[in-house]
């Protein structure tokens, strides 16, 4: 912890080291030290001011309207212990903890601090502070979209509670030189070339340097015209089927009497088919009835003589 080393000369700003992000700002905070080192009056009494939370530390800036020997008070995360958040019933919430003196910090020993948030927001501030301390301990400090990348290094942020409004935003003053990682961008990231200026209003036409499309992107070639006649209506041969596929001829009429529905695949024998000889056994009745008269006359005479005997 350091005393009177984190404020500007006019006591209206906080000095934030280069590479750190401002995570939160809480005005109207009261700082006191219930237990402190003896031999110094800088910790006596209650101080009112603005509290800043960065990626690595907490900075308290005493209000410039208050005459107090403590103008600023800086507490790094690694020197704070025993942090608690208290919620009294009839008073404002506050954060309490123990802080160790930093080397060359303007004092020695340790002290117990108490931060009372008169405007509320103590719980949110404590939660974000614990999160930032954990991230800093892992080597990945929290960042915000409000980070400033500049050729300078130390940022000064106004600390008065009622000075930062939408009509009058907080002023930023920069001092020092940045580390190597925050230097000027490489040549490839300079100003954009002339062809990448603002877009024309209404997109009237392409900027200078954009020629018309080549001919091959224009109308399609001749081979891609209307389809040939062969792709139109089908020819006459693809029309209705011929008459031969209509009703069957007269010879395919109903079967004679006594002929039942033949099983599938057992149609009647074709014309000129001869019956099997008598030695093959008797034919079924329906098959004999289905034979034509000329087939009956061709039976051998021996079968006739057996019938008459």
Swiss-Prot record:
Residues 251-309 are annotated as: Disordered. It comes from the Eukaryota. GO terms for biological process: egg activation; male pronucleus assembly; meiotic cell cycle; positive regulation of DNA-templated transcription. SUPFAM superfamilies: PH domain-like (SSF50729). Residues 251-272 have a biased composition (Low complexity). Residues 175-265 are annotated as: 10 X 7 AA tandem repeat of Y-G-X-P-P-X-G. One of its GO terms (cellular component) is sperm head. Sequence repeats lie at residues 175-181, 182-188, 189-195, 217-223, 224-230, 231-237, 238-244, 245-251, 252-258, 259-265. InterPro entries: GRAM, WBP2-like. Expressed in testis. The keyword Transferase does not apply. GO terms for molecular function: chromatin DNA binding; transcription coactivator activity; WW domain binding. The keyword Repeat applies. Keywords: Meiosis, Repeat. Residues 45-87 form the GRAM domain. Pfam families: GRAM. A motif (PPxY motif) lies at residues 186-189. Residues 298-309 have a biased composition (Polar residues). May play a role in meiotic resumption and pronuclear formation, mediated by a WW domain-signaling pathway during fertilization. This is Postacrosomal sheath WW domain-binding protein. The gene is WBP2NL.
